UniProtKB/Swiss-Prot annotation:
The lineage of its organism: Eukaryota, Metazoa, Chordata, Craniata, Vertebrata. Cleaved by caspases during apoptosis. Belongs to the acetyltransferase family. ARD1 subfamily. The keyword Metal-binding does not apply. Pfam families: Acetyltransf_1. Residues 196-213 have a biased composition (Basic and acidic residues). The modification Phosphoserine is found at S205, S209, S213, S216. This is N-alpha-acetyltransferase 10. PROSITE patterns: GNAT. Residues 196-235 are annotated as: Disordered.
Length: 235
């Protein structure tokens, strides 16, 4: 199972998934509005064949009088792929993107009062809290729970993760620099050792030459002496 950022070519399949899963449906232009205005915030879940089995459609609320916050327009997972944690993964990805791209402080959504399964998911698994009841929010006149999830803790965790990542990067660079410095010292020591060996070899060679010269001179002197003695004896 793969979770990834939604692309424009995914929008029609996201709409198809919506029609299969939810009573709240949207025209195609509404999907394009989200995809083109906030391309970082919507995600899809796809199976091993690349088919979309779940999605989250998200946006930022454009309220200048409030702190930056996102809104989940629609979240759906096909019945065949439920209870796999996909809803939580999709929600977390969208929330993280809201923090990283828009510094969102919280994320909101609406859910039908009668949708107990979704209410349980949002409250118990995804850490949303009911902020108010909005009467007759849906087209059929049903009330909605307006819910919010505070993103402060997630933002702090992301910040710590980035700090640790940056610290780790500096440690790696320092280790590489230290390794390079040690390698340079080893090469320098090796070069000095080679020069010392060459010096010793040169000294040994000079000593050998001297010894050979002395031996040669001694031999020549002996030959001359022997020749002289032989000459005296003959006379």
């Amino acid at each position: 199972m793969n979770i990834r950022n939604a692309r424009p070519e995914d929008l029609m399949n996201m709409q198809h998934c919506n029609l299969l899963c939810l009573p709240e449906n949207y025209q195609m232009k509404y999907y394009f509005y989200h995809g083109l205005s906030w391309p970082q915030l919507s995600y899809i879940a796809e199976d091993e064949n690349g088919k979309i089995v779940g999605y989250v459609l998200a946006k930022m609320e454009e309220d200048p009088d409030d702190v930056p916050h996102g809104h989940i327009t629609s979240l759906a997972v096909k019945r065949s792929h439920r209870r796999l944690g996909l809803a939580q993964k999709l929600m977390d990805q969208a929330s993280r993107a809201m923090i990283e791209n828009f510094n969102a402080k919280y994320v909101s959504l609406h859910v039908r009062k009668s949708n107990r399964a979704a209410l349980h998911l949002y409250s118990n698994t995804l850490n949303f809290q009911i902020s108010e009841v909005e009467p007759k929010y849906y087209a059929d006149g049903e009330d909605a729970y307006a819910m919010k999830r505070d993103l402060t803790q997630m933002a702090d965790e992301l910040r710590r993760h980035l700090e640790l990542k940056e610290k780790g990067k500096h440690m790696v660079l320092a280790a590489l620099e230290n390794k390079a410095e040690n390698k340079g010292n080893v090469l320098l020591s090796s070069g000095e050792a080679c020069r010392e060996e060459k010096g010793l070899a040169a000294e040994d060679s000079g000593g050998d030459s001297k010894d050979l010269s002395e031996v040669s001179e001694t031999t020549e002197s002996t030959d001359v002496k022997d020749s002289s003695e032989a000459s005296d004896s003959a006379s």
